[in-house]
Amino acid sequence: MKAVVLTLAVLFLTGSQARHFWQQDEPQSPWDRVKDLATVYVDAVKEGGRDYVAQFEASALGKQLNLKLLDNWDSLTSTVTKLREQIGPVTQEFWDNLEKETEVLRQEMSKDLEEVKQKVQPYLDEFQKNWHEEVELYRQKVAPLGAELREGARQKLQELQEKLSPLGEELRDRARIHVDALRAQLAPYSDQLRERLAARLQALKEDGGASLAEYHAKASEHLSALSEKAKPALEDLRQGLLPVLESFKVSLLAAVDEAAKKLNAQ
């Protein structure tokens, strides 16, 4: 029951900071969230890929070709890890600059969101109370049927299901009524929040477009700086890949040549 109210509160009020609001944790920056997800994904791909390479090399065909893919894979992952370490501070700087430039707008929107959240909290509390009462009423109606089933024989199962069906439909219909009522109560505040956001953006536009143009110019500037600072790391990645690719090509050509010799000798 609490999960329903929690979900609604998260949906209407907390947005991307829901974890911080409910758990009182320090909110992660956008870069921290992206970095964590990317790290988990890359590590999973890396470990999974290495397992496949190891399985192939252990196979009869892998042993016959002797491509040394596992050594090349380890070299590749080491190079990618080095690239990630080099680019990490650069991308962190980009996110820090972007957050700094939009701090005022984010503070204003957070203030609006907090105000709306306080106004709709009574409606959420009322919904929680009504939902609890409906569930308790349903439990009271179902309890005698459960006792009847325990006391009766198996053939009464169908009869019990027939009795439970209308009760379940009644609970669903009454829940829909409460949800619709809650939606109607929250609608004005949702519209109000949208209007405030539109007003904030309109104010930026009416400022001669200077503020929006400034945001765009600064974002472009930060992206250009990120691109320039990442070039050396990307070049290091390319240079690191060349020996790996060359080793793979030599091993593959040697394996093909060996196979051709065996065919000609037959």
UniProtKB/Swiss-Prot annotation:
GO terms for biological process: adrenal gland development; amyloid-beta formation; blood vessel endothelial cell migration; cellular response to lipoprotein particle stimulus; cholesterol biosynthetic process; cholesterol efflux; cholesterol homeostasis; cholesterol import. GO terms for cellular component: chylomicron; endocytic vesicle; extracellular vesicle; low-density lipoprotein particle; spherical high-density lipoprotein particle; very-low-density lipoprotein particle. Major protein of plasma HDL, also found in chylomicrons. The modification Methionine sulfoxide is found at M109. Residues 67-266 are annotated as: 10 X approximate tandem repeats. SUPFAM superfamilies: Apolipoprotein A-I. Residues 1-18 form the signal peptide. Participates in the reverse transport of cholesterol from tissues to the liver for excretion by promoting cholesterol efflux from tissues and by acting as a cofactor for the lecithin cholesterol acyltransferase (LCAT). As part of the SPAP complex, activates spermatozoa motility. This is Apolipoprotein A-I. It comes from Ailuropoda melanoleuca (Giant panda).
